[in-house]
Amino acid sequence: MTKTDAQGRHPQETATHAATTDEEVQDQWRAPFEVLSRTLVFQHEDHRLWWERAASKLATYLRLAKYSVGSQYQHLLMFYSVYAPNLGPWPNDKRDNVHWVCGICPGGENLEISMNYQQGAKCTVRIAAETITPAAGTDKDPFNLTAEKKMIEDLKALQPNLNFTWFNHFQREVLVPEEVALNNDEIISKVPFKNQRLHGLDLSEGAFMLKSYFMPAIRSAITGVENTQIMFESIRKLNLKNANFISALSTLEDWMVPTNGRFMEYWDGISYDAVDACKARIKIYTGIRMKSIEHARDVWTLGGRLQGEDIEKGFDLVARLWRRLMDEEPSTCEMKYWMQWVWELRTDVPFPVPKLYFSVAAAEDHYVSDTVVEILDYLGWDDLVQTHRALMDEAWSLGQTTKSYLAFSYISVTFHSIKGPYITTYGNPSGPRPVF
């Protein structure tokens, strides 16, 4: 007589039930990217390539940043539907199939993924991307507006509560209408980046925040009004009454306008993080070719206007990164001296908060990764050291390569009086393939 188990099942039934249970458990914990890749249908080959090669990295970022499984699915499906089919050709080895130059990455690429590390908080994953169509840059769509409009509409459909009050304000005050730009074709031809806006997303649990960047270069070229004047006037026209915000704005304007504020004018831009006047955060971007650590200190402090413990703590991090990424980093590429600077104007502090982006696209990835480990270790963020190392191995395969480039485009550093230091790494998913 055949024995049965406690539930009255025969041995073969028991084995089948156990195998089924194991499969169910395995399916429950299978990575969202793997599950979706088995199911999704792609519109064309480039859609598939952007999914397999870029979304796979985004999936690793989300998982290692400890986003919930539900949020991982949500953000991956957003990338699949809004971005992956509309990012244009996946770049070939020579990159000669890419016809549109974007201002997001140092090499003109149109997708960037970043990981923000900060004290006592979950990591934040961000993406910046410019969707394109075959007509971008041609007479039919010289400023790549068709793809941008579709992207905004798609994001609004996914998250209808997106607030465009300040979006419309800065569009009106910083940019020029398409018809005006078209009537000044000869002037516009001298501006290297033809897009007047770029967009990024801060990914959070169950939602995203749209971050739009408005570049005044085309308006400046047409009107003859300096970029800095355009940007500061656009902010003042918001009529914000917060005393801290007004103080910070005046301090930055006092330093930036007389010196023309920058030496690489096409990197100028303005963005905002919130539309609530009580929580307003506006950022002003510029590019400066740096000469020395003393030059960096002068810019960090706005010529001595910014002082205090928080400024000094922030510059200590700048100096440590400068030593590794500038003084000791062996590349001789001019690019590493081209640094992006950002000042954040907030309602909770009375001075502009500086942020420096080190340009590291020409540096070898293992070297940059080791530098990030050193600064995270110096800050005592042991758990984030492990997160970063896992990210480099799993998303960028640094553990299996001898050399690779463009796992990093930038490393940024800032120090907030309330939340402390922030370290952010920026990577280009469509960069050169690793050298094994």
From Swiss-Prot:
Recount the biotech application: Ergot alkaloids are known for their toxic effects on humans who consume contaminated grains or livestock that graze on grasses harboring ergot alkaloid-producing fungi. Due to their strong affinity for monoamine neurotransmitter receptors they may also have clinical uses such as treatment of migraines, Parkinson's disease and cerebrovascular insufficiency.
Please tell me where dimethylallyl diphosphate binds in this chain.
126, 211, 213, 283, 285, 357, 422, 426
Instruction: Write out the pathway annotation from the protein's UniProt entry.
Output: Alkaloid biosynthesis; ergot alkaloid biosynthesis
Looking up InterPro entries in the UniProt record yields: Aro_prenylTrfase, Aro_prenylTrfase_DMATS, DMATS-type_fun
GO MF entry, a single one: prenyltransferase activity
Q: Which reaction does it catalyse?
A: fumigaclavine A + dimethylallyl diphosphate = fumigaclavine C + diphosphate; an N-terminal L-tryptophanyl-L-alpha-aminoacyl-[peptide] + H2O = an N-terminal L-alpha-aminoacyl-[peptide] + L-tryptophan
Intrachain disulfide bonds = none
Keywords assigned by UniProt, alphabetized = Alkaloid metabolism, Aminopeptidase, Hydrolase, Prenyltransferase, Protease, Transferase
Q: Does the keyword Transit peptide apply?
A: no
Which EC number applies?
Answer: 2.5.1.100, 3.4.11.17
Segment Disordered: which positions? 1-24
Its induction, per UniProt? Answer: The expression of the ergot alkaloid synthesis cluster which leads to the synthesis of fumigaclavines is positively regulated by the brlA and stuA transcription factors.
Q: Where is the composition biased (Basic and acidic residues)?
A: 1-12
Superkingdom field:
Eukaryota
Q: Which residues form a coiled coil?
A: none
Q: Which Pfam families match?
A: Trp_DMAT (PF11991)
Query: Does the record's keyword annotation contain Cytoplasm?
Result: no
In the record, biological process GO terms are: alkaloid biosynthetic process; ergot alkaloid biosynthetic process; fumigaclavine C biosynthetic process; proteolysis
**Which family is it part of?**
Belongs to the tryptophan dimethylallyltransferase family.
Annotated function: Fumigaclavine A dimethylallyltransferase; part of the gene cluster that mediates the biosynthesis of fumiclavanine C, a fungal ergot alkaloid. DmaW catalyzes the first step of ergot alkaloid biosynthesis by condensing dimethylallyl diphosphate (DMAP) and tryptophan to form 4-dimethylallyl-L-tryptophan. EasL also shows tryptophan aminopeptidase activity with preference for linear peptides containing a tryptophanyl moiety at the N-terminus.
Against PANTHER family, the record matches this protein to: INDOLE PRENYLTRANSFERASE TDIB-RELATED, PRENYLTRANSFERASE ASQH2-RELATED
Summary of subunit composition and partner proteins: Homodimer.
Name assigned to this protein: Fumigaclavine A dimethylallyltransferase easL
Organism field? Aspergillus fumigatus (strain ATCC MYA-4609 / CBS 101355 / FGSC A1100 / Af293)
* Gene designation: easL
